[in-house]
Amino acid sequence: QMNMKTRPSRILSLFKKGTIGTVQKINLADPRVIEIAALSGVDAVWLCNEHVPNDWLGLEGQIRAARIHDIDTLVRVSRGSYSDYIRPLEADATGIIVPHVTTSDEARQIVSWVRFHPHGKRALDGGNADGQYCHLPIDEYIRHSNEERLIILQIESPEAMENLNEIAAVPGINGLMFGPGDYSHRIGKPGQHMVEEVAMARK
């Protein structure tokens, strides 16, 4: 019988140690760019389905390139149906970044879509890269997906800042990420990332 091994998250391991990882944002679809980033020493690459015209096959190739070099892949998803959230994970991304989260109810809905039982109601397949094409035992697949896959929420508006503590308290969330571009836009100062209101929110 084959001994199927799962890959732990580098970023999550660093989180648990209280240290900071390096993440490189990549807007190019060529998987060789991912390999170059990995060889430069980063811990993870950040790919984007919100603003970048990635297709699913191309994204899968980028994730595979990262996996070859043992670095994490974080995919910023499009806001949409549950499949927009789980397909990067099924392609074996290490985690997702969900933009424009404003309330704890939204955060709980995201967890429900992305986590498996007993933490959520994610649709169960296992026949993709993250389940090693049905070679990974189902209990190990569920455990690994729940424990080693990240959910990071972007805080990008004054409304989200008002609800920050409630959002952060939702079980199943691994981290919050501030979005200065949209935050500056929402306060009527688009692109002014260094003004006091944005700087204070970033803290």
Question: PLM features: residue spans?
Answer:
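N-terminal amphipathic alpha-helix/helix-capping segment at the start of soluble metabolic enzymes
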Residues: 2-25, 135-147
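Conserved, mostly hydrophobic/aromatic
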Residues: 24, 37, 48, 96, ...
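Short, well-ordered coil/turn segments that N-cap beta-strands
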Residues: 17-22, 42-43, 67-73, 93-94, ...
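Glycine-rich, proline-tolerant flexible connector loops at the mouths of alpha/beta enzymes
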Residues: 33-61, 181-196
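Active-site mouth loops of central-metabolism enzymes
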Residues: 15-31, 74-78, 149-162
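Conserved anion-binding
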Residues: 83, 95-171, 185
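Short, acidic/polar
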Residues: 26-40, 79-87, 159-170
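Alpha-helix-loop-beta-strand connector modules within alpha/beta enzyme cores
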Residues: 56-82, 86, 90, 112-120, ...
